[in-house]
Curated annotation (Swiss-Prot):
A nucleoside 3',5'-cyclic phosphate 1 binds at residues 174-301. Residues 1348-1358, 1404-1416 have a biased composition (Basic and acidic residues). The modification Phosphoserine is found at S444, S453, S1160. Isoform A and isoform B are expressed in the entire brain cortex; cortical cell bodies of adult brain. Sws and Pka-C3 are colocalized in all neurons. The active site is at S985 (nucleophile), D1105 (proton acceptor). A motif (GXGXXG) lies at residues 956-961. It holds the Pfam family Patatin. The keyword Transmembrane applies. Residues 332-410, 1330-1425 are annotated as: Disordered. A nucleoside 3',5'-cyclic phosphate 3 binds at residues 598-727. One of its GO terms (molecular function) is protein kinase A catalytic subunit binding. This is Neuropathy target esterase sws. Disruption phenotype: Progressive degeneration of the adult nervous system, associated with apoptotic cell death, glial hyperwrapping, and neuronal apoptosis. Also, vacuolization in the neuropil.
Length: 1425
C-alpha cells in the first residue's frame, strides 16, 4: 500500500506536471479498481460456497425430519411395537444390504458417481476460477545413470601369475598365440639382468639377438646421428619390452645383425628380462607350425602397424623402402639368342640389354645345368614404332601419360583375344596347375606377348623356335636361391616356375587385389611398384599413384602379400620390356608343406627391401592388445605417445572435480588418439579405455621428433590433420555439453564397424531382419553378414574352441578390414558364437516386436552383463499390414536403462511370413537383385550405423512456417531421405507432424487445420487474461496443439526428433528428445509476452521459445549424429539500414518526423524492436555459424513479405516454399551437388561379384596349410557364387561343394521342408535347384563344351580343396578313415565323369543321384560331412 499512498500524494499536487498527474491518477484508479474487483470476486465466491453448504445442510435436516415423521406415523398407526421382533432371515437380509451399501460407496469413488463426486465437481470449478489446474501427468522416462563399468576402467590384478612371467607373456604376445608347453620352454631360456642408473642395456655394435622386457625401473632407447648427437626414441617402463621384429627374422634366417644406430641405457636402477631369439629357433624345430605362424604375425604387424602409421598419418611412402639396392648380375637369365639379333630393337628403354653371348651359352651347356624335357617355343612379331618412341619413366616423372594417369596400361593377365575382363590368362592357367598334376607337369612353356602373338628374342620379322632350357634352368636356380633351397630341392620348385615377357606398362597386380598374388622374380628389365595417393589435401588434384621403388634384375617382389595372406598393398607394373619368372600363391603353399623354412627367406627378402627408418621405427612402435575395460592412459598422466586404433573401439571419459564422469567421445578403427596432448606437451585431459577387445599401435613422442627432423613433410601432414580436427571441434562446440542436453549431444562418432544383432525372444524374425538390413547397407558400401553356420562352414565346426582363437580372431579382423560394416547375427541362446559377437561388436542392436510385451528376458540380461561397456540400441519392429503406430515405447526404455537409443522400423509383409530357412533364402536371393528403398526405415537404420544420416532442421518464423510444408514436398520429390528432424517454434510443429505421419498429404491437412484455428479471433479473445506475465493464458493455444498431436510421446515418433527451448530458470537452452510431444512443441512456440512460459513436467523449469537462443539448430543436429543437414530458415530479417541520429535522440523529433509528410522518414528502432533485437542476439550469431559450416545446406525461401501472424495465407506461403524448393533442388542436381543427400538414389542394385566372396578372399593361416590342420568343410573358392550367383542369397552366405550338394540332396530326398531345418541344409537345397536349371540350360550346347566346363570346375574344386586343406585326420584319430573315404570317393567320381564324355550334364546329375542312393543304402559307404 506504500505505492498507493505515493501515487495518491502525487495526485494531490506534489507534482506540477499535468501529464504526470493525469497518469498517476489513472494508474491509482486502475490499481484501486483492480483491488476492489478481486476483493469483490473473492467475497462473492465465499458467499456462494457458504450458501451452497447451508443449502445442503438444510436439505439434509428436512430429509431427517421427513423420515422422523414417517416413522412416528407408522408407530402411531400400528400401536405398540416393542413386542415385535425380526426374523433371523430378515436380519441377515438387512445387514447384508447395509454392508453392500457401504461397499458400494467405497468402490464408487473410482467412478464419476457416488460419494465425493459433488465435492470433486466443486473443486474442479474452484480450480478453474482460480487457475489452479492439475493435469494428469503422463508416464515419464526414468533417468538412470549408467553403471560404473560403463565409464570406469577395469582394475584387476593377476596375483596368480608371477610378475616376470606376466610381463613376458604380454611381451611375446606380439609373436602370436603360444600354447602353454611352448611358453614354458621359452621361459627356461630367460635371464635376469640388473642395471644401475647409466648402465647400457645394449649399445652400437652389440649383436641384435634378444628380446628385453623391463621388470622394474626405466630404460631409455635413443638413436645416434652421424654428427654424434643423440635423440630419444622412447622410454620403456615396467612391463614394456624392447625388441625389433625385423631383427627376429634376421636371426632365424641365419643373418644376425648388429645395433648400428640404436642404444638403450638405464635411467634408474632396473631389472630386465632377457630372452635370446635363439630360444625360438629351438622351439621351431619341433613345432614348424609355430614358426610359420610367428613369421606371418610379424609380417601382418609390419603391414598394419608400421605402414599404417608411417604412411597414412605421417605421409611417408617412398621413404619406407630402399630404392637403390645392390644390383645383381644375372648374365644367364636372358637366355641364348641368335647372334644376328639386333640389340637396339630389343633393348628396353631403361633396362639392361637382353643379350647373352654365345660364350655364356656354351659355358652353361657344358656345366650341364638345365631342365631336361622342358622346351620353350618363343616367337616375336614386329614391334610397333610407337613402342620405341615411348617416353622414359624416371622417379621424377613416373607416369607415362601427360595427365599423370595410366590410361593406356594393360593387365598381364587380361585375355589376349578380346576385351572380356573375366577371361584372363592368370585364371585360365590355374586350371593347368591342379593338385593332381602339379608335381608331374613337364609341359612346354610358350612365352606370349600381351597382344596375343608369340614372343621372340630375335630381330623383328624373324620367327624361330629355339631351345629355352637354359632360361628355365636359370630361373629355377635363381628362385631356388631366393627361397633358401638347396640344389637337391630344385625338383620341388621346377614344375611351378613360369616365365612371362612383358611389354611396358603391363600391370601384374593392383593394390587391394588378393587373387593374383605371386612371387615375381625379375630376370631382365625393371618393375615399378606404386601405391595409391592417400594425402587428403591432394586427393582432388592428383589422382595418380605414387611411385615407391623399382625392382631390378635379380630381385624378388610379392613376398609380403604372400606371407600375410592379405591383399596386395602395392600396384606392380612393368617399366620397360621385362622378363619375369614367377610362382603362384598355390604353388608356394605347396612348397611350404615340403620345406616350411622358406617362409624365413621370403620374410628376409621383405626385410632387406625396407629402409633403415623402418627398422628404427620398429624399435619404437609397439603393438598393444587391450581387453574390454582396460585403460590406454588415464587422466592427468604425462602424454608421451599417441595411439592408432587398428581394430576395436575406445571411449574417452573425463572426471570432473566433483567426481562426476562424463563421456567426451568415442574412437573407432583408424582414429588417432591423444595426438593433441602429445604435441602440446600437456597432461592427459581424459581417460581412454577399451570398449571391446582392441588392437592399437603406440607411437612415442621421440619417434615423432626423429622423423620430423629427417622428413619435414611430416610437419605439414600433422598441421593438416590438427587443423581439420580443430575446425571440427569448433563447429561442434556450440550446443554440446549444455545443461539438459542428452548423452548423444556429446561428440561421439556414430560410425560403427561391427554390429551385433540380438533377438529379445524367439518370435523375432531375426534372419529376415538381418537380410533386410543387409540389403539396405549394400547400397552404401561393402557389407558382410556372419552367422554361426557361415563361420563353421568357412573355418570348420571346431572353430569356436580355445585352440582356434588366433585363427578365428584373425579371420574376423580381416573381414572387418574389407567391409565398411560387419553384421554379426547372434544365436537365440547364449552360445559361444553369441559371446564372440558381444566381444566383437561396436554396438549391439536389441531387436524386439513393438506390439508384444516389453518385459526383459533372462537372455537379454546376460547380454548386458557380458557387454556392459558396449553401446546398446533398441529396435522395435511393426508389421506394415496392421497400420499401427508406435506406442508404449517409454515402457520398453524404462525396463532397459542400458539402452542409449531406440529405432522404430516398419516392416513389409514378407518379414513376418512364416517360412522355412530354405524359402527365406530363396525369397531374399531375388530381393537382393532389386534396388533398396532409400526412404524405408531399414535404410534409415543403415545410414545411422554407417554415419551417413541426413538431418532436416526447420527454423521458426510464425505463419511463414507454412513454407516448411512446401519444402518437405520438394525434398520428397527430389528423392532425399530424411533420417532425423529438429525444429524450433513453428518448425517444431511442422517437424513433429512429419515425424508422426510421414505422409505429405496428411501433414498438409493437419497443418492447414491448425492454421485455420489460429485465425479464429473470438477464441483468442476468450483466452485473454490480465497481462502480468502474458497477454493470453495459453489455454486455447494448448488445446489447438493437443488436438493436433494428442497424448503422444516423442519416443513414439517414427523418425528421431528433437526440439529446442529456452530455459529462463537456468538461463540456457534445452534439447528435448523425450517426453510429452505437445508440451515441448508448445514450449518451443511460447513467444514472450504473448504466451506464458510452460513449466517443464520433469523439474518445473520455465521454458520459452527456443528461437531466442538458436532459431536454426543445425549445430545441435550435427552433434546428434547427422552427417548431412538441410536447414530451412523462415525467420524474419532485421533491417540493418538504420538512421544515424547522433549522440542524443528526442522522442518529439521522431513524432514530428513520423507525422510530417514533407520530411524524409527516419529508421530508428522502437522499444519493442530493441527488446526483440536484444533477445535474438545469440540467435543471430548462431545462425551465421550455421551458414558458414561445411556440413549444412542453408536454404531460405522468399517469404519475407509475409507477416509473422499471417496464418490465413497458409496455402499461398506453402506454394511459395514448394516452388522455390523444387527449383532449388533441380539446380543442385544439375550442378552435381545433390549427391551427398541422395547418393543412394538411382543406384544400380547390389550385384554379387566373385571378388567380394568370402571364399575368394579370406584369412590364410599358413600354419594350417603347411601342417594340414583338420577342417570339417572343404570350401570351394573357385566355383562358389559363379553359376547361381543371381539367386543364391547374400554374398556372405557360402555354399558347399557340388559333391556335398548331391549327397545332402539324396539324404533329404522325399522329405518336405520344415521350419526346423538349418540354414546349412537350406542353402544346399537351393543351390541344387539352381544347378539343375543351369545343367538343363546347357543341354543345347555341344557336349564337348559341357564336358570341358565340368572338367574345369572339378579341377578348380580340387585346387580349392588343396588350397584350404583337406580333412585327412580327425583330432581323436577316428576321422581318418572317413576322410580318406570321402577323398577317394571324390576322385572316383571325377574319373567317372571324365570317362562319360558322351553324357550330357543332366545325365551326369541323374547318375550321381543314383550312385548316392546306393551309397546311402549301404552303411559302409556313408561319408562323414
Amino acid at each position: 500500500m506504500d505505492v498507493l499512498e505515493m501515487l495518491r500524494a502525487s495526485a494531490s499536487g506534489s507534482y506540477n506536471t499535468i501529464f504526470s498527474d493525469a497518469w498517476c491518477q489513472y494508474v491509482s484508479k486502475q490499481i484501486t479498481a483492480t483491488v476492489y474487483m478481486y476483493f469483490a470476486l473473492v467475497m462473492m465466491s465465499l458467499l456462494f460456497i457458504a450458501w451452497f453448504l447451508y443449502f445442503k445442510r438444510m436439505a439434509r435436516l428436512r430429509l431427517r425430519d421427513e423420515i422422523a415423521r414417517s416413522i412416528s406415523t407408522v408407530t402411531n398407526s400400528s400401536g405398540d411395537m416393542r413386542g415385535l421382533r425380526f426374523r433371523k432371515r430378515d436380519k441377515m437380509l438387512f445387514y447384508g444390504r447395509r454392508m453392500l451399501r457401504k461397499m458400494k460407496n467405497v468402490s464408487g469413488q473410482m467412478y464419476s458417481s457416488g460419494k465425493g463426486y459433488k465435492r470433486r465437481a466443486v473443486m474442479r470449478f474452484a480450480r478453474r476460477i482460480l487457475q489452479l489446474r492439475r493435469d494428469n501427468m503422463p508416464l515419464e522416462m526414468r533417468t538412470v545413470e549408467p553403471p560404473a563399468e560403463y565409464l570406469e576402467e577395469t582394475i584387476e590384478g593377476s596375483d596368480r601369475v608371477p610378475p616376470d612371467a606376466l610381463y613376458m607373456l604380454q611381451s611375446i604376445r606380439i609373436f602370436g598365440h603360444f600354447e602353454k608347453p611352448v611358453f614354458l620352454r621359452l621361459c627356461k631360456h630367460t635371464q635376469l639382468l640388473e642395471l644401475m642408473a647409466g648402465d647400457y642395456l645394449f649399445k652400437i655394435t652389440d649383436p641384435d639377438d634378444s628380446v628385453y622386457i623391463v621388470q622394474s625401473g626405466m630404460i631409455n632407447v635413443y638413436i645416434s646421428n652421424a654428427d654424434g648427437s643423440t635423440l630419444s626414441l622412447k622410454t620403456v617402463r615396467k612391463g614394456e619390452s624392447v625388441t625389433s621384429l625385423l631383427s627376429f627374422i634376421d636371426v632365424l634366417s641365419g643373418n644376425p645383425s648388429y645395433y648400428k644406430t640404436v642404444t638403450a641405457k638405464a635411467i634408474e636402477k632396473s631389472v630386465v628380462i632377457r630372452l635370446p631369439m635363439q630360444a625360438f629357433e629351438e622351439v621351431f624345430q619341433d613345432n614348424p607350425d609355430v614358426m610359420i605362424r610367428v613369421i606371418q604375425v610379424i609380417m601382418i604387424r609390419l603391414q598394419r602397424v608400421l605402414f599404417t602409421a608411417l604412411r597414412n598419418y605421417l605421409g611417408l611412402n617412398a621413404e619406407l623402402v630402399q630404392n637403390h639396392m645392390r644390383y645383381k648380375s644375372v648374365s644367364t637369365m636372358s637366355g641364348p639368342i641368335n647372334s644376328q639379333t639386333s640389340q637396339s630393337s630389343r633393348q628396353a628403354p631403361n633396362g639392361p640389354p637382353m643379350v647373352i653371348s654365345q660364350m655364356n651359352l656354351m659355358q652353361s651347356a657344358v656345366s650341364g645345368t638345365g631342365s631336361s624335357g622342358v622346351s620353350v617355343t618363343v616367337t616375336r612379331p614386329p614391334s610397333s614404332p610407337s613402342r620405341h618412341s615411348r617416353e622414359e619413366h624416371t622417379l621424377s616423372d613416373p607416369n607415362p601419360n601427360p595427365d599423370g594417369s595410366f590410361h593406356g596400361t594393360t593387365n598381364l593377365f587380361t585375355e589376349v583375344h578380346g576385351d572380356a575382363p573375366n577371361a584372363d590368362l592368370f585364371h585360365q592357367q590355374q586350371q593347368q596347375h591342379s593338385v593332381g598334376n602339379l608335381s608331374t607337369r613337364r609341359s612346354s612353356i610358350t612365352l606370349m606377348a600381351p597382344d596375343g602373338s608369340h614372343s621372340c628374342l630375335q630381330t623383328p620379322g624373324v620367327t624361330t623356335s629355339i631351345d629355352m632350357r637354359l632360361v628355365q634352368s636359370s630361373a629355377v636356380d635363381s628362385l631356388r636361391k631366393e627361397l633358401g633351397l638347396s640344389e637337391e630341392d630344385s625338383h620341388i620348385i621346377e614344375p611351378f616356375v613360369e616365365l612371362r615377357e612383358l611389354e611396358p606398362n603391363v600391370t601384374l597386380i593392383t593394390e587391394g587385389n588378393a587373387d593374383d598374388v605371386c612371387v615375381w622374380f625379375v630376370m631382365t628389365g625393371t618393375l615399378a611398384v606404386y601405391q595409391s595417393n592417400q594425402d587428403a589435401t591432394r586427393a582432388k588434384q592428383d589422382k595418380s599413384d605414387m611411385l615407391i621403388h623399382f625392382v631390378h634384375p635379380g630381385e624378388i617382389v610379392g613376398g609380403l602379400a604372400m606371407l600375410t595372406g592379405e591383399a596386395s598393398a602395392y600396384t606392380i607394373r612393368s617399366r620397360s620390356i621385362t622378363r619375369i619368372a614367377f610362382i603362384r600363391r598355390a604353388a608356394i603353399y605347396q612348397i611350404m608343406r615340403q620345406r616350411p623354412r622358406i617362409v624365413l627367406d621370403l620374410g628376409n627378402g621383405v626385410v632387406r627391401r625396407l629402409s633403415p627408418l623402418v627398422r628404427q621405427c620398429d624399435y619404437a612402435l609397439d603393438w598393444i592388445f587391450l581387453e574390454s575395460g582396460r585403460a590406454v592412459y588415464r587422466q592427468d598422466e604425462s602424454s608421451d605417445s599417441t595411439y592408432i586404433v587398428l581394430s576395436g573401439r575406445m571411449r574417452s571419459v573425463i572426471t570432473h572435480p566433483g567426481g562426476k564422469k562424463e563421456i567426451v567421445g568415442e574412437y573407432g578403427k583408424g582414429d588417432l588418439v591423444g595426438i593433441v596432448e602429445m604435441i602440446t606437451e600437456t597432461s592427459r585431459t581424459t581417460t581412454v579405455m577399451a570398449v571391446r577387445d582392441s588392437e592399437l599401435a603406440k607411437l612415442p613422442e621421440g619417434l615423432f621428433n626423429a622423423i620430423k627432423l629427417r622428413y619435414p613433410i611430416v610437419v605439414t601432414k600433422l598441421i593438416s590433420f590438427l587443423s581439420h580436427r580443430f575446425l571440427g571441434s569448433m563447429q561442434t562446440r556450440s550446443g554440446s555439453g549444455a545443461p539438459g542436453a542428452p548423452v548423444e549431444a556429446n561428440p561421439v562418432t556414430h560410425k560403427y564397424s561391427t554390429v551385433a544383432l540380438v533377438p529379445i525372444t524367439d518370435e523375432v524374425p531375426m534372419t529376415p531382419f538381418t537380410y533386410e538390413l543387409y540389403h539396405s547397407l549394400c547400397a552404401i558400401g561393402p557389407v558382410l553378414r556372419l552367422t554361426s553356420d557361415v563361420v563353421r562352414k568357412q573355418l570348420g565346426s571346431n572353430i569356436f574352441e580355445a585352440a582356434n582363437e588366433y585363427r578365428l580372431t584373425s579371420w574376423l579382423a580381416q573381414q572387418e578390414d574389407r567391409n565398411i560394416i560387419t553384421l554379426y547375427q547372434c544365436d537365440s541362446s547364449l552360445s559361444a558364437w553369441t559371446q564372440r559377437c558381444m566381444r566383437q561388436a561396436d554396438v549391439i542392436l536389441i531387436v524386439g516386436l513393438g506390439d508384444r510385451s516389453h518385459l526383459v528376458g533372462k537372455f537379454e540380461r546376460e547380454i548386458d552383463r557380458l557387454a556392459m561397456r558396449t553401446q546398446k540400441e533398441l529396435v522395435l519392429l511393426y508389421p506394415e499390414a496392421s497400420n499401427a503406430k508406435p506406442a508404449n515405447t517409454l515402457s520398453w526404455l524404462n525396463a532397459r536403462p542400458w539402452v542409449t537409443k531406440h529405432h522404430h522400423v516398419l516392416c513389409v509383409k514378407r518379414i513376418f511370413t512364416r517360412k522355412s530357412q530354405y524359402r527365406i533364402n530363396d525369397l531374399y536371393s531375388r530381393v537382393l537383385l532389386s534396388e533398396p528403398n532409400m526412404h524405408s526405415d531399414f535404410s534409415r537404420l543403415a545410414r545411422w550405423l554407417t554415419g551417413n544420416s541426413i538431418g532436416l532442421v526447420l527454423g521458426g518464423g510464425g505463419a511463414r512456417g507454412a513454407a516448411h510444408i512446401g519444402m518437405l514436398k520438394a525434398i520428397q520429390e527430389a528423392g532425399i531421405p530424411v533420417d532425423m528432424v529438429g525444429g524450433v517454434s513453428i518448425g517444431a510443429l511442422m517437424g513433429a507432424l512429419w515425424c508422426s505421419e510421414r505422409n505429405i498429404t496428411t501433414v498438409t491437412q493437419k497443418a492447414r487445420e491448425w492454421s485455420k484455428k489460429m485465425t479464429k479471433w473470438f477464441l483468442q479473445l476468450l483466452d485473454l487474461t490480465y497481462p502480468i506475465t502474458s497477454m493470453f493464458s495459453g489455454r486455447e493455444f494448448n488445446k489447438t496443439i493437443h488436438d493436433t498431436f494428442g497424448d503422444v510421446s516423442i519416443e513414439d515418433l517414427w523418425i528421431p526428433y528433437f526440439t529446442l527451448t529456452t530455459d529462463i530458470t537456468a538461463s540456457c537452452h534445452r534439447i528435448h528428445t523425450n517426453g510429452s510431444l505437445w508440451r515441448y512443441v508448445r514450449s518451443s512456440m511460447s513467444l514472450s509476452g504473448y504466451m506464458p512460459p510452460l513449466c517443464d513436467p520433469k523439474d518445473g523449469h520455465l521454458l520459452l521459445d527456443g528461437g531466442y537462443v538458436n532459431n536454426l539448430p543445425a549445430d545441435v543436429m550435427h552433434n546428434l549424429g547427422a552427417a548431412h543437414i538441410i536447414a530451412i530458415d523462415v525467420g524474419s530479417q532485421d533491417d540493418t539500414d538504420l538512421t544515424n541520429y547522433g549522440d542524443d535522440l528526442s522522442g518529439w523529433w521522431l513524432l514530428y518526423k513520423k507525422w510530417n509528410p514533407f520530411t524524409s522518414p527516419v529508421k530508428v528502432p522502437d522499444l519493442p524492436d530493441i527488446q526483440s533485437r536484444l533477445a535474438y542476439v545469440s540467435c543471430v550469431r548462431q545462425l551465421e555459424e550455421v551458414k558458414n559450416s561445411d556440413y549444412c545446406e542453408y536454404i531460405r525461401p522468399p517469404i519475407d513479405k509475409y507477416k509473422t501472424l499471417a496464418f490465413g495465407s497458409f496455402d499461398e506461403i506453402r506454394d511459395v516454399g514448394y516452388v522455390f524448393g523444387k527449383n532449388y533442388f533441380e539446380s543442385m542436381a544439375k550442378a552435381g551437388r545433390l549427391g551427398r543427400f541422395n547418393q543412394w538414389f538411382n543406384k544400380e542394385p547390389p550385384k554379387r561379384v566373385n571378388h567380394a566372396s568370402l571364399n575368394e578372399y579370406t584369412f590364410i593361416d599358413l600354419a594350417q596349410i603347411v601342417c594340414r590342420l583338420p577342417e570339417t568343410y572343404a570350401v570351394n573358392t573357385a566355383e562358389l557364387f559363379s553359376e547361381d550367383e543371381d539367386c543364391d542369397g547374400y554374398i556372405s552366405e557360402p555354399t558347399t561343394l557340388n559333391t556335398d550338394r548331391r549327397r545332402i540332396q539324396v539324404s533329404r530326398a522325399g522329405n518336405s521342408l520344415s521350419f526346423s531345418e538349418t540354414e546349412m541344409d537350406s542353402d544346399v537345397e537351393l543351390d541344387l535347384k539352381l544347378e539343375r536349371k543351369t545343367d538343363k540350360s546347357t543341354q543345347s550346347s555341344p557336349p564337348s563344351n559341357s564336358r570341358s566346363d565340368m572338367r574345369g570346375k572339378e579341377e578348380a574344386r580340387h585346387m580349392s580343396n588343396w588350397h584350404w586343406g583337406v580333412k585327412h585326420k580327425d583330432e581323436t584319430g577316428s576321422g581318418a578313415t572317413e576322410a580318406t573315404k570321402t577323398q577317394t570317393g571324390q576322385e572316383q567320381e571325377l574319373q567317372q565323369e571324365q570317362q562319360d564324355q558322351g553324357a550330357t550334364a543332366e545325365q551326369l546329375v541323374d547318375k550321381d543321384k543314383e550312385e548316392n542312393k546306393e551309397n546311402r543304402s549301404s552303411p559302409n559307404n556313408e561319408t562323414k560331412n
